Every structure is written in C-alpha cells, then in structure tokens.
Amino acid sequence: MTEEKNPVVIMETSMGTVKIELFKDKAPISVRNFLSYVKDGYYDGTIFHRVIKTFMVQGGGMDENLQPKKTKFAIKNEATNGLKNLRGTLAMARTSVVDSATSQFFVNVVDNAFLDHAGKTPDRFGYAVFAQVIEGMDVVDAIREVKTGNKGGHQDVPVEPVFINSIKLVE
C-alpha cells in the first residue's frame, strides 16, 4: 500500500511564486476548506492585507480596497493537531471565537509558539497550522519587508498592495 502524498499548491503573488504543501492528515478540515476556496478561484486577486515583519503575513479575504470577500461557513479549529506555528507554516486566521476561520490564512515568518494550542479557553486554544512553505520562502520574506501603514481602519497594510494572483493545486 502506497502512502498518498499531501496536496501541493502554487501561490502566484505579485512578488513571486510560493509552493505550499498541505497537511491533509493532520488538518483535514482546514485543508478541505482551503482547497474548496482554491478550486473556486476565490483567492485570485486578493491581497496580503496585514503584514507584520516580526510576526506573519496574512491574506486570503480582502480585495485591494480592503473590502472583504464573501466567505463560506466557518470551520472547526484544528489547533489540537500537534502542528506548531513555526517559521514557514501556514495557519488559519480567525477572530477571538475559536471556530471562526473561513478563507483567511497567514504565513508565520518567525516561530510563533504563543499561537500554538495551550488550553481549551478561547485565549489559549491557538491557531490551526495546516500547511508549510516548501519553496519560495524568500518571496514570503520579501513580502514581510514591504512598507506598511494604516488604511481604511486597518493597521499593518502594505502601502503598495501585494496581490495573490492565483493559487492552483498542482499535485
């Protein structure tokens, strides 16, 4: 019996290409959700709307005018899966409500242990890691270095928009 490979996607950004492996065994709900948005072309033309050089880059839900795109239903938070918020991992973004993730995700640009599951209360539940950058971390590092400011009531917004041109499933 051969082990089925994890799905891989290619994210084309306005700053370069990032190849990402999805951990379908450890985060099946998050991966299925992410791939449903990928297959719908949902991420095409969205931006990285929150960039914090010493923390993470977040995208997957807003257009260049910071207007949120319509999302599907919220999913169960899989932060108890044992995966850690290490540099280069992707996790589902959410509100303070534990099971509120929809389309938005972030790439950890440093190890962020404080985002890992540490308890059952909302403030300690953590953020579900579901993927890992396998090529193109240099592109993510370039994104984290862009100049940011305040725009439309949001902080840490790139002054020049950084686009997700497309995300496509390759294997």
Segments the model singles out, each with a brief description of its role:
Residues 1-171:
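Cyclophilin-like peptidyl-prolyl cis-trans isomerases
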